[in-house]
Amino acid sequence: SIPVTPCGARTGLSGGSLPVKSGLVLSLEKLNSIIEIDERNLQATVEPGVINEVFQNAVKEKRLFYPPDPASKGSCMLGGNIAENAGGPKALKYGVTKDYVLNLEVVLPSGEIIWTGANVLKKATGYNLTQLIVGSEGTLGVVTKIVFRLIPLPKKDITLLVPFNCSEKACDAVSAIFRAGVTPSALEFIERDAILWTIKYTDIKLEIDDTVQAHLLIEVDGDNLENLYEDCELIENVLKKFECGDILLANSSSEKENLWKLRRSISDAVKSNSIYKEEDTVVPRAELAK
């Protein structure tokens, strides 16, 4: 028998698309249709070769929201996101890929084509095959169609960039924000070298003080702008206890886009400045400073 490894855009960090020696790679990049966006049922049916960001933009036009947004969202494919159970910055508030998958069309190794679930939010019949397939890296079958659930698009968001002279204090501030009762839609830690290399690598203009050792990139979202400002005030009060510097508030869409471009460009920037081996690691939030 010849081993077959399905693959999408090959942007993953854990090697899920690497073929077995003497095996074949099955590229799904040409299965790239958004079949349906069902606004009434808040669902979408897509093929696995659709680019994550293309899908996000398509549902956004209908005031709907698909939260999983890996750093590689501009190039990664939804089939790969399924295979790896991808997350992204918004996983903090909204969860990861598995939380939005309702149903999958899968070709099994036997050649049989099955649907793993149903296009409903609650299904109590039989095994939960959908969640078995998500994160299985293509080892159980080839996903050929995906049914996602969607949510209403938040109307407002605010983005903050917060400098710290001490990396450990920046890390400790993260848990303190949650203890204060605020759940940001995204919260990213960026250390000094990463942000300096990324500024050099991109066309983003940002002044970094010589004493700054780390930044927190924070986003809050919702439907009421007044409530978001209250969240930001609460976050600011927490951060001051950890001796943060002057907080940069993104005042326009372009400023927000630049800050997130900064975050999403870190991997490529670091690669261009060093001998770099990518890893995809997770640590408990409270242990981050260690």
Predicted segments, located by residue:
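Noncatalytic alpha-helical scaffold of FAD-dependent oxidoreductases
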Residues: S1-K290
